[in-house]
């Protein structure tokens, strides 16, 4: 599933092509994605102008002057591309939004776990209402994590991936951040010290910022708007490396399922 760096990469690739563009039309080839596409998409978007494109957690919001925003989530396999207007649709090309420039924004989603919804006015959609702080913001600190973790018995990896704690940190970047901070993903969240949470917050910020710089992680289905691969996958220390040697100490990496997610870590470097 695309995580925060992949969504941020998508945002940065799309924005120059979308902001200020008038929408000519909308084609819905498959309106039943994770949730049905609401009728406002077809009714309100034609004739509207895109005023901004932004990100909240793993969601993209395309703001318009039509009294609301398109709320997008890429799901497990979704991608957004800006293409010439005469580009023929392929399998799983579910939505086209045609633009004044003669180009179109196309949403492709083979597994249909993504969504295309409508957020009215300035009121946050229900999907955004209970989200935690952005990990690259000043609100996300080790002190914040430590205070929130008190009394929690869940594994620290599960705690870090809780979107009510901090948004956008999925399986890849949680595993990599815990490795850099030297914290076992199995340790109870409430038993991690303040000093170690400060290291963890710093690791999350550094790794996410670097992954964005590298264009995200190309794993399975993720495609950036220009079709270019992300290069962070080449620098992964633990994620997806079960049974391989730790790049720091050389010992064989361990594997377990934590919170129904595959987890790889180094039993020597992470305590």
Curated annotation (Swiss-Prot):
Could you say which residue ranges form the zinc fingers (FPG-type)? Answer: 237-271
Question: How is the cofactor bound, in the record's words?
Answer: Binds 1 zinc ion per subunit.
Pfam families named among the record's database cross-references: Fapy_DNA_glyco, H2TH, zf-FPG_IleRS
| Cofactor(s) this protein requires | Zn(2+)
Gene3D superfamilies membership: 1.10.8.50, MutM-like, N-terminal
For this UniProt record, the keywords arranged alphabetically read as follows: DNA damage, DNA repair, DNA-binding, Glycosidase, Hydrolase, Lyase, Metal-binding, Multifunctional enzyme, Zinc, Zinc-finger
Enzyme Commission number(s) from the entry: 3.2.2.23, 4.2.99.18
Q: Which domain of life is it from?
A: Bacteria
**Gene Ontology MF terms in the entry:** 8-oxo-7,8-dihydroguanine DNA N-glycosylase activity; class I DNA-(apurinic or apyrimidinic site) endonuclease activity; damaged DNA binding; zinc ion binding
Q: Does the keyword Hydrolase apply?
A: yes
> What are the catalytic residues?
2 (schiff-base intermediate with dna), 3 (proton donor), 58 (proton donor), 261 (proton donor)
Keyword Amino-acid biosynthesis listed: no
Which reactions appear under catalytic activity for this entry? Hydrolysis of DNA containing ring-opened 7-methylguanine residues, releasing 2,6-diamino-4-hydroxy-5-(N-methyl)formamidopyrimidine; 2'-deoxyribonucleotide-(2'-deoxyribose 5'-phosphate)-2'-deoxyribonucleotide-DNA = a 3'-end 2'-deoxyribonucleotide-(2,3-dehydro-2,3-deoxyribose 5'-phosphate)-DNA + a 5'-end 5'-phospho-2'-deoxyribonucleoside-DNA + H(+)
Q: What are the GO BP annotations of this UniProt entry?
A: base-excision repair
Give the binding site residues for DNA: 92, 111, 152
Q: Which CDD domains match?
A: EcFpg-like_N
Subunit and interaction comment: Monomer.
Q: Which NCBIfam families match?
A: fpg, PRK01103.1
Tell me which family the UniProt entry assigns to this protein: Belongs to the FPG family.
Q: In UniProt terms, what function does this protein have? A: Involved in base excision repair of DNA damaged by oxidation or by mutagenic agents. Acts as a DNA glycosylase that recognizes and removes damaged bases. Has a preference for oxidized purines, such as 7,8-dihydro-8-oxoguanine (8-oxoG). Has AP (apurinic/apyrimidinic) lyase activity and introduces nicks in the DNA strand. Cleaves the DNA backbone by beta-delta elimination to generate a single-strand break at the site of the removed base with both 3'- and 5'-phosphates.
Q: What is this protein called?
A: Formamidopyrimidine-DNA glycosylase
Q: Which gene encodes it?
A: mutM
